[in-house]
UniProtKB/Swiss-Prot annotation:
Pathway terms, separated by semicolons: Amino-acid biosynthesis; L-arginine biosynthesis; L-ornithine and N-acetyl-L-glutamate from L-glutamate and N(2)-acetyl-L-ornithine (cyclic): step 1/1; Amino-acid biosynthesis; L-arginine biosynthesis; N(2)-acetyl-L-ornithine from L-glutamate: step 1/4
Protein name: Arginine biosynthesis bifunctional protein ArgJ, mitochondrial
Record family assignment: Belongs to the ArgJ family.
Stored Gene3D superfamilies: arginine biosynthesis bifunctional protein suprefamily, ArgJ beta chain, C-terminal domain, L-amino peptidase D-ALA esterase/amidase
Biological role: Catalyzes two activities which are involved in the cyclic version of arginine biosynthesis: the synthesis of acetylglutamate from glutamate and acetyl-CoA, and of ornithine by transacetylation between acetylornithine and glutamate.
GO cellular component: mitochondrial matrix
GO molecular function term, any single one: glutamate N-acetyltransferase activity
PANTHER family: ARGININE BIOSYNTHESIS BIFUNCTIONAL PROTEIN ARGJ, ARGININE BIOSYNTHESIS BIFUNCTIONAL PROTEIN ARGJ, MITOCHONDRIAL
Length: 464
């Protein structure tokens, strides 16, 4: 696996006192986060990337804020979008584009940071269209099916794009395109907002039908707050040179997103702009993946799901005000849906998240969140929630340093907690909360972080 990293659990030794701002530069990356930024990569054939400064956000004079990713040949493509009812203009535009083109013939993705172009009416849709048109002109113009460029935006809601700045600089973004690591890193940096580091990964893989072919996959994502995807703001682009038919792209992406970007939460908010896109140009050759029943499809689905999960975890590690990376694992559930709801509820609980920050082994908050997770409406009879049985429920802290788990609740009965041991576990940067429901054999995993004082500071100052 190229450009990989192994983040070993460690105790926090750094207090985060830096100020977050739009788009991150190498000089501003906190020392504790630099280990997550790759220094090299293995990037898919036929793709080029760039990131340049155009000054989308007033006052930004130094940080790139326009990202351009292109393919030298048409791509099969799919995307998963936010389910927020107030969907941003680029979401509407890009969804319609993919539907119109039948998930084929995509040549590029153009992304701006600094302004979300959300809740901007017809003018916002016109701006999204102008962005795509400017990109299309650099890629040879529109074809009979119209635009071939997906557009994304991220930043403050309710403001119009400085569209002249963007459109007037797409040519410069095209001129800056390159296929090297620095080009991909510049592209990943340009989509950042309150992120403290660019989130970029790449890896190689093979497929059963073409064992001698080395395929490549690269992806970038952004997000640090407003993260509770139901595809938060969360943007992601994954590109591969594997040959994949347009008809199977939506299903393989949805499966991956459900187990990655839709399994993380920072603050429980779902953005107006969430978009995760997958592009495949087939430049590496080999047999096209055209059937969901093929061994190649299954193999690629595993690769994409694992890759997407690793990308999504980077978002959690950069959560606004976060000092801990927390895995919530719910097992022995009557259904996967119930397990996901319980894991999600625990992951979103402010009381759980603040207790983790305070290194307080207050398992009652975990149990409380578990208990109401499946109640769909006030007054619902608790006996109707058969997926949770109090006397079968177990809760533990699982350290990530290889030591034994600390049992907090066993079959509904509280354990005498070794507070010193609990404190040791909660000092770790990485930890796991394990909930065993004892009602079946299904499971689900969520990834989240804690809440610190800095979260309030960041979001209180967001527009200043």
């Amino acid at each position: 696996m190229a450009a990989s990293f192994k983040a070993l659990p460690q105790q926090l030794t750094l207090t985060r006192s830096f100020a977050r701002c739009y788009s991150v530069s190498a000089e501003s990356i906190p020392a504790a986060k630099k280990k997550y930024v790759p220094t090299e990569g293995s990037y898919p054939q036929g793709f080029q990337a760039s990131g340049i400064l155009v000054g989308v956000k007033p006052g930004n004079k130094t940080k790139p804020d326009l990202a351009f990713l292109t393919s030298d040949r048409p791509c099969a493509a799919a995307a998963v979008f936010t389910k927020n009812k107030f969907q941003a203009a680029p979401v509407t535009f890009s969804r319609d584009l993919l539907k119109r083109r039948g998930n084929r013939g995509i040549r590029g993705v153009l992304i701006n940071s600094g302004c979300a172009n959300a809740v901007t009416g017809k003018g916002g849709l016109e701006d999204a269209s102008l962005m795509a048109k400017a990109a299309d002109e650099q890629l040879g113009g529109e074809d009979g099916a119209g635009s071939s460029t997906i557009v994304m935006s991220t930043g403050v809601i309710g403001q119009r794009l400085p569209i002249d700045k963007i459109v007037g600089n797409v040519g410069a973004a095209h001129g800056a395109l390159g296929s090297g690591h620095k080009d991909w890193l510049a592209c990943a940096t340009a989509i950042c907002t309150t992120d403290t580091f660019p989130k970029l990964m790449s890896r190689t893989f093979s497929l059963p039908s073409s064992p001698g072919v080395e395929y490549r996959m690269a992806g970038m994502t952004k997000g640090a707050g407003m993260i509770h995807p139901n595809m938060a703001t969360l943007l992601g682009v994954v590109a591969t040179d594997a040959p994949i038919a347009p008809g199977v792209m939506p299903s393989v992406l949805k499966h991956a997103v459900d187990r990655s970007f839709n399994s993380i939460t920072i603050d429980g908010d779902t953005s107006t702009n969430d978009t995760v896109a997958l592009l495949a140009n087939g430049a590496a050759g080999g047999q096209e993946i055209s059937s969901v029943d093929s061994p190649d499809y299954a193999a690629f689905q595993t690769v994409l799901s694992d890759f997407s999960a690793d990308l999504a975890k980077l978002i959690v590690r950069d959560g606004e005000g976060a000092t801990k990376f927390v895995t919530i694992r719910v097992v022995d559930s009557a259904s996967e849906e119930a397990a996901r709801k319980v894991a999600s509820t625990i992951a979103r609980s402010p009381l759980v998240k603040t207790a983790l920050y305070g290194r307080d082994a207050n398992w009652g908050r975990i149990l409380c969140a578990t208990g109401y997770a499946l109640i769909s409406e006030p007054g619902q009879d608790i006996n109707e929630v058969a997926s949770i049985v109090s006397e079968k429920t177990n809760v533990s802290f699982v350290p990530t340093d290889g030591s034994a788990e600390l049992k907090l609740l066993v079959n509904g009965e509280p354990e005498t907690v070794d507070e010193a041991r609990a404190s040791e576990i909660l000092e770790l940067e990485d930890l796991e909360i394990l909930v065993k429901l004892g009602t079946g054999d299904k499971q689900a995993t969520y990834w989240t972080c804690d809440y610190s004082h800095e979260y309030i500071t960041i979001n209180g100052d967001y527009r200043t």
